[in-house]
């Protein structure tokens, strides 16, 4: 084992993934294929605006671009004005980011008085969260680049499982390394080609953490007719949803059970809460409304602020993203006679 990455898990502890040297070489090869399919070339200068660290996205794309001989700017995420400065001064021709962060970059470009013609961007590889054709069109219009989707998950390898080519008619799967199946999410039985269901993947060459029929919980379908680009690998359609309750917020996997675990560990917090996800501008916003046990706490501004800060800090440790926390009166949130519907996702993706 030469490297370890991790993804979010339902318990709040990360799911740890191990890689051998052969795994890293295979990962680089898979990423290089998808980068070239998306239009990437040796002559490109690529800015990677994924966060570096245990998250697989940044290093996965990084080593793929280096494999094809491109110049890599490991900008990481955040400090967006600096990102734009780097992009302009270093002449970046390719951008790697979540689609929502790509759109936020476009807003900052505009605020800084920079025209898209002043940038040299020509392609964008976007992933880690769902995106619509409309979102891609906006990225194209605002940044002047050609956007493509790519797909992966840490348990399988990270990014590099599948990606769009320049014809954008499904994501080509590296099926010599990852064997895909579609199953009915209720019966768990395989279904016919072209039907929508849950994607299941078996790793064929991975050594550090092989997976046999791993349920991704992602809903898609397989496309087996020949692509106009000439590649003959099977393709998968855009992800249409999940078969579990996982949310993807700013590229991070978030489970309601993680949030509940944090809230229920705090004696001042009551048992009822709601989770609201919305997209403000082009960035996802996570808001958690939660009842306090003692209504008197709401009249003590100092104690209230301290508790909000404490809840936010604990959530940040578990979720790895910031959340807005609102403390409300006991018995003020909606009650449910059946299964509680605690999550409201207002994003239109």
Go through the PLM ranges and name each one.
Residues 6-9, 34-41, 86:
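Short, charge-rich binding segments
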Residues 16-38:
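Conserved structural elements of the adenylate-forming
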């Amino acid at each position: 084992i030469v490297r370890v990455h991790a993804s979010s898990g339902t318990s709040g502890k990360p799911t740890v993934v191990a890689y051998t040297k052969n795994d890293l070489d295979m990962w680089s090869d898979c990423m290089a294929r998808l980068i070239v399919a998306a239009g990437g070339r040796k002559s490109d200068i690529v800015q990677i605006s994924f966060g570096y660290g245990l998250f697989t996205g940044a290093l996965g794309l990084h080593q793929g671009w280096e494999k094809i001989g491109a110049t890599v700017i490991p900008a990481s995420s955040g400090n967006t004005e600096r990102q734009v400065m780097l992009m302009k001064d270093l002449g970046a021709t390719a951008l790697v980011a979540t689609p929502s962060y790509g759109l936020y970059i476009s807003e900052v470009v505009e605020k800084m008085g920079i025209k898209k013609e002043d940038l040299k961007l020509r392609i964008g590889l976007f992933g880690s969260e769902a995106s619509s054709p409309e979102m891609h069109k906006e990225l194209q219009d605002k940044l002047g680049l050609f956007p493509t989707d790519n797909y992966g998950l840490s348990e399988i390898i990270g990014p590099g499982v599948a990606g769009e080519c320049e014809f954008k008619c499904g994501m080509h799967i590296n099926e010599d390394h990852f064997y895909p199946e579609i199953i009915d999410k209720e019966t768990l039985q395989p279904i016919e080609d072209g039907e929508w269901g849950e994607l299941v993947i078996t790793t064929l060459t991975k050594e550090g953490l092989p997976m046999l029929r791993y349920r991704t919980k992602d809903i898609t379908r397989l496309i087996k007719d020949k692509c106009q680009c000439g590649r003959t690998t099977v393709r998968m359609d855009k992800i249409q949803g999940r078969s579990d309750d996982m949310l993807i917020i700013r590229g991070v996997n978030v489970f309601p059970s993680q949030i509940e675990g944090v809230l229920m560990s705090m004696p001042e917090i009551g048992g009822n809460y709601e989770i609201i996800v919305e997209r403000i501008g082009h960035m996802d916003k996570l808001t958690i409304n939660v009842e306090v046990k003692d209504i008197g706490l709401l009249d003590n501004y100092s104690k209230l602020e301290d508790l909000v800060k404490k809840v936010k800090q604990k959530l940040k440790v578990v979720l790895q993203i910031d959340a807005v926390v609102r403390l409300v009166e006991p018995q003020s949130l909606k009650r449910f006679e059946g299964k509680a519907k605690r999550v409201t996702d207002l994003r239109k993706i």
